From Swiss-Prot:
Transmembrane segments: none annotated. GO terms for biological process: DNA recombination; double-strand break repair. The lineage of its organism: Bacteria, Bacillati, Bacillota, Bacilli, Lactobacillales. GO terms for cellular component: bacterial nucleoid. This is DNA repair protein RecO. The keyword GTP-binding does not apply. It comes from Streptococcus equi subsp. zooepidemicus (strain MGCS10565). Involved in DNA repair and RecF pathway recombination. Belongs to the RecO family.
Length: 256
């Protein structure tokens, strides 16, 4: 074992035996690891093992088995996310997506920073729908999916309006629409925004303004990309899909 200090974000925890927990933490320095916490009911670690908790951890890393949390400081509990059912649901999906995207025990400080910044912006109140879309698009390469939404797959023209071709796994300009009669028939603004999402530096993102109709179109297209190219269906994603069916009722009850 080795002692290592690292920032970390708790992905989830689960009960283990009578009063112990297994806690999965995405650490900046050591990747995603499973940590064993004994006697959680009496442990000083109880405040930092809940999902969506970030902290500076002192860790005992075991490369062949469970690791251990020695100490922590600088806890960030994402209070606004945890107080808002909708923000919490989307943030939980982002956590699950990060967990699914890379192997355990392999450091990925770039993805860690991207996840942390995404959660920070959701906490600050930026549009969680669009932040989730940006995260989904930029994390595609971690699943081995690399797409160019910037120029036509045939002539590399950057002239809009583009449409997406599943046949060619890329966009077509109007001069090459005929190459795929089964192309999506997308609103060109969807491709424009997806291209922006793919290249935007989230650290520079200050405001988001996308109307509800465009959000629905983006959601449908990104869902199709994940179904066709990634092939995962996370429980947290199923849950936020269900939110769309009855979310308006809850928002009305909450006075939103």
């Amino acid at each position: 074992m080795r002692i290592q200090r690292s920032l970390g974000i708790v992905l989830y925890n689960k009960n283990y035996r009578e009063d112990d927990k297994l806690v999965k933490i995405f650490t900046e320095a050591a990747g995603k690891r499973m940590f064993f916490v004994k006697h959680i009911g009496r442990s000083k670690l109880a405040p930092v093992v809940q999902p969506l908790t970030a902290a500076d951890f002192l860790l005992k890393i075991n490369d062949s088995s469970l690791s251990y949390i020695e100490d922590y400081n600088q806890v960030e509990a994402y209070r606004h996310i945890n107080e808002d059912f909708f923000r919490l649901s989307y943030a939980s999906y982002v956590l699950a997506l990060a967990d699914a995207a890379i192997p355990d025990n392999e450091p990925d400080p770039q993805l860690f920073a991207f996840l942390k910044k995404t959660l920070d912006l959701i906490e600050e109140g930026l549009d969680y729908d669009i932040l989730t879309n940006i995260f989904e698009i930029q994390i595609l390469d971690r699943f081995g999916v690399r797409m160019n939404f910037h120029d036509c797959v045939f002539c590399h023209s950057t002239n809009l309006p583009f449409d997406f071709s599943h046949k060619y796994s890329g966009v077509l300009c109007p001069q090459h629409y005929h190459e795929d009669e089964g192309r999506y028939g997308l609103d060109p603004n969807v491709i424009y925004l997806i291209n922006r999402f793919q290249t935007i530096n989230i650290d520079e993102l200050k405001t988001i303004s996308v109307n509800a109709d465009m959000k629905k179109k983006l959601r449908l297209f990104i869902d199709a990309l994940y179904e066709d190219y990634v092939g995962i269906r996370l429980k947290s994603k199923v849950f936020i899909d269900d939110l769309a069916k009855w979310g308006d009722i809850m928002k009305n009850k909450q006075g939103l």
